[in-house]
Amino acid sequence: MNPEYLDFEQPIAELEYKLNELKQFSEQSKVDISDEVERLKTKLERLTGDIYSDLSDWQIAQVARHPKRPYTLDYIPHIFTDFRELHGDRHYADDMAIVGGLARLGQRSVMVIGHEKGRDTKAKVSRNFGMPRPEGYRKALRLMKLAEKFKIPVITFIDTPGAYPGVGAEKRGQSEAIARNLYEMAVLNTPIIACVIGEGGSGGALALGVADTVMMLQYGMYSVISPEGCASILWRDAAMAEEAVTILQVTSTRLKKLNLIDTIITEPSGGAHRDVAEMSRTLHDAFLSELDRLEAMDDATRIHQRLQKLRAYGNFLGE
């Protein structure tokens, strides 16, 4: 069993292994087996499409947490140019679980902010596995205020298990930092686009998620609590997480029906981790198109629509 593949992806892993073996044999033996290679490629594409066309909610949640799934720092060099990272909250520290800075999207200057989990063990520890402390959210707000001052659009990438629940974070005002971001983002006088690229966990995600347009990748997840946390509370058993996922309705299609997100961004066959370049091109075009729409509005209309959308969350529509 290949640990870089999820359980339901093992048939894909086996076929990819055979395909790589065939390619190596062809290179070493100088035998032309291009027809067989193409046949296996076609079979692999069909198999991947079949598996990913019928994923359960739990399987989608697993894809959202895939060990190879692209993070914020994977997307930035593919989507933006001239990225200049900015550091610190000017109050306490520089939280590496939040990255942000100025960049160019086409001919536009933008402020890019996102959660970052880290790829290897050292990076994961230094970035606290993508779980921000209060100083991370205050850094994000500082950058948003800077963007507002210079009339620069804000683009956020959401990918976190949740805000860090440690004692130190609570002492430094974790709940206040999150609440302040919600309050300020609701009326920030510049266009805001938020995109859930992996897992969006609770208030830790929402603190970057108040926006004019909320996008979500096809195999992302967005929820008030992690499935394991929900299962532990409801059933006293984290092993019930699979059932909790269905109840929580964490997937993009379910959230779109509830009008909790605005746009679902289609991923490459087999998920974003299979083709980061293609996924980045799709996001690049989606951001440009949406900024054209948002910047065509006057400020008062855009903020009014943002507030109306927020007020509509959770409306009871009847039986």
Curated annotation (Swiss-Prot):
Catalytic reaction equation(s): N(6)-carboxybiotinyl-L-lysyl-[protein] + acetyl-CoA = N(6)-biotinyl-L-lysyl-[protein] + malonyl-CoA
Biological process (GO), any one: fatty acid biosynthetic process
Gene Ontology molecular function, alphabetical: acetyl-CoA carboxylase activity; ATP binding; carboxyl- or carbamoyltransferase activity
EC number: 2.1.3.15
Name of the top EC class for this enzyme: transferase
Gene3D superfamilies (UniProt xref): 2-enoyl-CoA Hydratase, Chain A, domain 1 (3.90.226.10)
Record keyword Transport present: no
Ranges where the CoA carboxyltransferase C-terminal domain occurs: 36-293
Pathway terms, separated by semicolons: Lipid metabolism; malonyl-CoA biosynthesis; malonyl-CoA from acetyl-CoA: step 1/1
Keyword Lipid metabolism: yes
Cell compartments where the protein resides: Cytoplasm
Subunit structure as annotated in this protein's UniProt entry: Acetyl-CoA carboxylase is a heterohexamer composed of biotin carboxyl carrier protein (AccB), biotin carboxylase (AccC) and two subunits each of ACCase subunit alpha (AccA) and ACCase subunit beta (AccD).
Entry protein name: Acetyl-coenzyme A carboxylase carboxyl transferase subunit alpha
Source organism of this protein record: Dichelobacter nodosus (strain VCS1703A)
Lineage: Bacteria, Pseudomonadati, Pseudomonadota, Gammaproteobacteria, Cardiobacteriales
Chain's gene name: accA
